[in-house]
Amino acid sequence: MTQKTRTRFAPSPTGFIHLGNIRSALYPWAFARATGGDFILRIEDTDVDRSSQAAVDVIIEGMRWLGLDYDEGPFYQMQRMDRYKAVLAEMVNAGHVYPCYMSVAELDALREAQMAAKEKPRYDGTWRPEPGKTLPAIPEGVQPVLRFKNPQGGAVVWDDKVKGRIEISNDELDDLVIARPDGTPTYNFCVVVDDMDMAITHVIRGDDHVNNTPRQINIFRALGREVPVYAHLPTVLNEQGEKMSKRNGAKPVTQYAAEGYLPDAMVNYLARLGWSHGDDEIFSREQFLQWFNLDHLGKSAAQFDEAKLRWVNAQHLKAMADDQLAERVQPFLAALDVSGLDAGWLAQSCALFKDRCSTLVELAGWLKLLVTGAEPSAQDVSTHVTDAVRPALAKLAQALATCEWTKAAIAAAIKQVLLDTGLKMPQLAMPVRVLLMGTPQTPSLDAILSLMAREKVIAKLNLV
């Protein structure tokens, strides 16, 4: 029987979550969904001084917005301390762990001596018990750390799903501290116990964890447990080519929601930021989950490009059904103090403007102009509303006052005014657009007018 896929996302709640972080949630989520497995959320909150519930809430909010639903969790490491200590006791009893009484001053002196000798700084095994070895006298009043007895000789080898075969000599690994003097376990040990207890089959995470992997594999083996499959994702770079981080100006994921990006568009963009399916650039969430596997993860760092993200979002806006788009844009209209709009009218208006927009914020801006109109700039008025066109504007106002208020009837009224005045369409359309929408660039004039209130249109035209 094939083992069920179980993946996890294990963020530290020490600040907001940015796109580089959330991509490390997207891929394990997608792999679990693509294979009928489970996706687990684990909060690695052992850095008590920097962790906060507010940061946890932001992580969950960002995941919820993107639709990255989890099957189990959130589990909190700080709530599992008893379990970690129980496994530590098992390892002590099995001889895999030993107490080390070396002081910080002694470790610093050892490190300085090794660096002076051009050696790699590492713990030298002073307190590691070996057959026939006499250990130093235990100093009084010193609480030891617990170190993992790393295997000597041989190598740790794994086939990384992104980086390929990786081999690290055990001689490169010293005996890792897995519990502090106060008994609290350290990161690498907690991760192994969590992955073991949660039966994680695939660890998909950033490549900043590669150096932790051989140590974690050795702890897995000491516990007699099967080692999960590892896939270490390349770094996400910002637009300046630096590692994406809060320090380097990365935005919270939730800010993209506020800026009017669609969650499916963000999933599409993030998916392509390190994975590919041929030349396909635009795809739905459902297509992504049908196509996703670990074999097509990229090996090189991916660079964020906000212009490309806007383009992807624009494609999803265009493809979205008008009634769905009308529902999505309403919170953004509310932020502009526009509400109570007819659902059918709103869907029609979205259909008219969505091809011109990259975000829901932009779409809401256009829709507000339909409702409230705009004050044109003096420059646009002087350029487009000339003495030559004013009589035509007056004629159009008269025609619109009596015609049926439909796109076809409005188009016929405009055509008649053009015939009567000898003007070309741009000569009439430009000033009307400026007066009503505050810009000479809009969709077709008859479509715009049919969606605006007749009284407002006529009042604006009569002002000149």
Swiss-Prot record:
Its EC number is 6.1.1.17. It holds the Pfam family Anticodon_2. ATP binds at K246. A motif ('HIGH' region) lies at residues 11-21. The keyword Ribosomal protein does not apply. It is an enzyme of class 6 (ligase). PROSITE patterns: AA_TRNA_LIGASE_I. It is found in: Cytoplasm. The keyword Zinc does not apply. A motif ('KMSKS' region) lies at residues 243-247. It catalyses: tRNA(Glu) + L-glutamate + ATP = L-glutamyl-tRNA(Glu) + AMP + diphosphate. GO terms for cellular component: cytosol. GO terms for biological process: glutamyl-tRNA aminoacylation. Keywords: Aminoacyl-tRNA synthetase, ATP-binding, Cytoplasm, Ligase, Nucleotide-binding, Protein biosynthesis. One of its GO terms (molecular function) is ATP binding. InterPro entries: aa-tRNA-synth_I_cd-bd, aa-tRNA-synth_I_codon-bd_sub2, aa-tRNA-synth_I_CS, aa_tRNA-synth_I_cd-bd_sf, Glu-tRNA-ligase_bac/mito, Glu/Gln-tRNA-synth, Glu/Gln-tRNA-synth_Ib_cat-dom, GluQ/Sye. Monomer. Catalyzes the attachment of glutamate to tRNA(Glu) in a two-step reaction: glutamate is first activated by ATP to form Glu-AMP and then transferred to the acceptor end of tRNA(Glu). NCBIfam families: gltX_bact. Belongs to the class-I aminoacyl-tRNA synthetase family. Glutamate--tRNA ligase type 1 subfamily. HAMAP family: Glu_tRNA_synth_type1. This is Glutamate--tRNA ligase.
